[in-house]
């Protein structure tokens, strides 16, 4: 199959969200006077991931997720806060974190050299993602970057891909490839939209879901081997 349009997920695929979150949370919690920062992180991170899964499954809204996660976490440790205010405060920290994985920039440079058109396709908060991308070194390789909050829809919804297809000149599904680490968002969404996909699986996770990717790779070199 010959592809032209490469749709890249960002977090956990190209951008190192775990490092970004670790740095931002530490700074944020220190400034909030939290005593046991590690205990807070140990509670917050899985809780936050669970909320994002709920959002994928349409159990909650993006606004509810953003405005409730810190209220829930602080409440767990006996402190009542304004969740919306804390969310805005945290944004100032996380949006400064543009760490990418080793080899990500080289991967994108080689793909551009090979004639591919690169587009970002990310679920996230616009202000946060735009800030992080501004701090990163990967942004210049993309023709455009589509953020779920801006589109008013998110992966894995078919509408997310339909909106992207209308915004990319000359786009056809047959020439497109979705690349990402999430079976439930990137791969399930690609399948539903009729777009071939690559499951980026660097941790060699077992796929126990009914979602079947077109390709599976564990590192960037394997991806380059597919996209010769």
Put a short name on every predicted segment:
Residues 19-23, 102-106, 131, 158-159:
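Generic recognition of short, well-ordered alpha-helical segments
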Residues 79, 116, 195:
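Short glycine/serine/threonine/alanine-rich loop segments
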Residues 103-115:
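Catalytic-core regions built around general acid/base machinery
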Residues 33-34, 78-82, 107, 159-160, ...:
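A broad, low-specificity signal for short, low-complexity segments enriched in glycine/proline
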Residues 2-102:
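N-terminal helical cap/lid subdomain that shapes the substrate entry/recognition surface
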Residues 1-6, 109-112, 125-228:
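Asp-based, Mg2+/Mn2+-dependent phosphohydrolase catalytic module
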């Amino acid at each position: 199959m010959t592809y032209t349009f490469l749709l890249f997920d960002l977090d956990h695929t190209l951008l190192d969200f775990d490092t970004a979150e670790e740095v931002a949370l530490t700074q944020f919690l220190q400034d909030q006077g939290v005593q046991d920062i590690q205990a807070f992180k140990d509670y917050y991170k899985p809780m936050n991931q669970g909320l994002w899964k709920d959002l994928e499954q349409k159990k909650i809204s993006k606004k509810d997720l953003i405005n409730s996660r810190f209220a829930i976490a602080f409440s767990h440790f006996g402190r009542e806060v304004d969740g919306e205010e804390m969310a805005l405060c945290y944004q100032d920290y996380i949006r400064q974190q543009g760490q990418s994985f080793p080899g990500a920039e080289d991967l994108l440079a080689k793909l551009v050299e090979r004639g591919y058109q690169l587009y970002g396709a990310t679920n996230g908060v616009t202000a946060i993602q735009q800030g992080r991308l501004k701090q990163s070194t990967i942004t210049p390789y993309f023709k455009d970057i589509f953020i779920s909050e801006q589109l008013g829809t998110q992966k894995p919804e078919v509408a997310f891909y339909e909106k992207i297809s209308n915004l990319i000149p000359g786009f056809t599904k047959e020439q497109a490839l979705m690349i990402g680490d999430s079976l439930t968002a990137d791969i399930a969404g690609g399948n539903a939209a009729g777009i071939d996909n690559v499951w980026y699986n660097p941790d060699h996770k077992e796929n126990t879901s009914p979602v079947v990717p077109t390709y599976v790779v564990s590192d960037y070199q394997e991806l380059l081997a597919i996209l010769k």
